[in-house]
């Protein structure tokens, strides 16, 4: 076999990981290789679980035994042989950073360079008055003064008092004793021999005249003595006045970073001063998070038309004897009644209720004990509701009670000290190019590129910052190249979509400039508009041209056509996949009749465009005056009874419009939720729908216990079946025996999770397979019970498709399983951990759960890119489900980039024209045909190509 090995290809023989069927494959090295196929066909098993896993394992084995003991061992993939592997780097789309301290700037390391730039070339300003502060040694001060024109008349002043109340007699007396004869007091030149009496109730400024000099080549020694004397007298600060064209001009010099007016010192400019993750630079109030849990008045008083006795103060139960007695005393002292609606209280009364009246206004009340045995009498100052709630919060029993108080009565809001800017005032007072570091981070990537292109620095600053600026510009360009020019660097990492997070990591890899590496990417085009797709492809080909092998799992048509080598796995999903259906250039794959990908590229398979568009039921929801984030007073109409898509380039405002404004306002009004709502003017037409459901990509659970079976509600019915078997009845096993959430039938070593959680403190928790049950979750006695020859673990390990056949005779189970299969999830396991599901898979599980419910025909379904991770054939299947929902009278509103889906819509709302501050406008609306005729719409241009095919 030795002759099959060479440096030009990666050789795979006998790959059997997961559903792969003994695959043999040769992949060319240093090429752009795209792996395609239906969802669940085995693409990720080949790319990540075989190629990447083996690359990682070999790298680990190359380390010393000492290093390996900290990393643990990695299992060898189920494969006979892999040769020609390079060091592997995986860039997946589902590992979004949830750390609230992580931002786009920190994870791309651009913020580190910003910190360095501000520390080396920043201009400090007083955080109070805004005056620029410069630190200058004595020699530099003297050189600056001597550089003024010869013959200039100057005065050297020592500002011994700056804006302080008092008579300052001692200061004046000391100046006289030191031999000084003049001082400028409150701007007026005064002889120290005069009788000087200052008003002690007013603020004064006293500047001692140390010397008067006419500049010339022979005065340097005298000037130096005078400057040093003035600096010593005024604690490192001097004022020098000079005559310029009959005007007196003042120049301030400081030996330290201190404001001459306010006396506020600024610490030495170091990179750590600009880090919100370092106590030296972080805002002391919010510790650098930029936000805090604050008491929410709307939650404390949800209905201000009510009185205390009617329950206006949600934090206090009016039926509590203690609360009633105390507030009766508060009302008497405040001059109102407990039957007075809160909104009718005067400003004075309201202020007393909220903030108290100080130590002088005490309240007196008697608390009768519930037992009836005696009473307690109190006479104390009323601190106000806020202080009282803070005390009760601090005294809460344990974290659970504190969390309950936070959820019910508090909201996350911008820190009132730093206003969400995370840093201490001294750091925010430092500018480069007129902007402080936070203002710079608030610019989009494209705006930042423009800022640094026009940045003007002094000659010395340019030399110091040259290398830093080079790195910053390069990294910003990489972000732009992967289609993320609309992002701001202050954007929290936890708010990024999976696709955005992946493209950020891709940009970071470009910046590392590695060669000879095998990059493996998972659908980098997710969330990307067709307009930006070419830039992403250019990035992938750039990585390839640097001498790397780039392997991409992808469904995007343009990427598939660009591939040097295309591998199509299939032909179906799950047990029906796992084979190499076709491999070669895209043109070669198109000739393979069995390849659905090839037939799609060839145009043989396609989604038929509807011959007519639904007009809807004549009703509509109108949302107007939306100004949240970058939206520019946008107003939209959503025709009910239609399938409507919101389109636009990345960052144009789609998610803001749908997820931050429309969904929360509808949910709050219809479903009685209390989500924060973005800025808008008004909404109408809500009465035309009775339910709004947001089917998003958040996980269906956050622990290994959560799985599709429990989420859609079939696991209860399956446990009933097992409990009804003769074996279970003979042993007295009830339904609970087959639950991994309660004691009895579960494995107690892992408590039914199948894994043991190892807490890593500062790192994410690690899950390892339980060594007692081997990951089966249940104990041996429970696993001995079988239904149709399968135990409960066997059933949980079935794919949805296998389970559909297994439970075909049980309608209430098979109906729910069929909905999972209908949304393209036939390949996932019934008991598959929620932690292993991608965002797109989790979204489709939720969609299946909704499909299984009885439709009212007046529901608005909201979805954000449900085609994520879907092959063309899966998209076709999903669209049939979506159209079925609309046929039942419901409305579907969807954010989408997939052109096949967009062309299926009845109505489009296109936002743009660009992302970030250049977006936020409605560019086009109407049917796909109408939008395709709008030249300003990027979406319309691509739709036109699709419609013209």
Each language-model region and where it sits:
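Conserved phosphate-binding elements of NTP-dependent enzyme cores
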Residues: 1-949
